[in-house]
């Protein structure tokens, strides 16, 4: 019997690999990279790439669910980037940018 997780991983790979080939691997291993506390409060959204002095720079955009998490994550940037480097096997992400998303409240 196949696990649902395997099917979900395949779907994540197909959808997000179109945006950037490294994003699915980061998303699938996100809970291992940042730990349980941050993995429930922040998610990787996309990877932006730009060229600076003939070198490609990858920026991981992360969406946090509250202001406290958005303020705390940048302090762990070096650790998170090092863990991503370990999981991918090379330095793929050079910076990270954390944004806060506030869901619209329902008005009755």
Curated annotation (Swiss-Prot):
This is Uncharacterized protein RP826. It comes from Rickettsia prowazekii (strain Madrid E).
């Amino acid at each position: 019997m196949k696990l649902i997780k395997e099917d979900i991983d395949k779907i994540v790979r197909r959808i997000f690999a179109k945006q950037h080939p490294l994003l699915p691997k980061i998303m699938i291993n996100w809970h291992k990279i940042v730990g349980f506390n941050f993995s429930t409060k922040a998610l990787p959204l996309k990877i932006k790439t730009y060229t600076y002095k003939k070198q490609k720079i990858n920026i991981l955009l992360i969406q946090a669910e509250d202001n406290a998490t958005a303020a705390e994550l940048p302090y762990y940037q070096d650790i998170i980037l090092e863990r991503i480097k370990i999981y991918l096997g090379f330095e793929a992400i050079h910076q990270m940018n954390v944004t806060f998303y506030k869901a619209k409240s329902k008005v009755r």
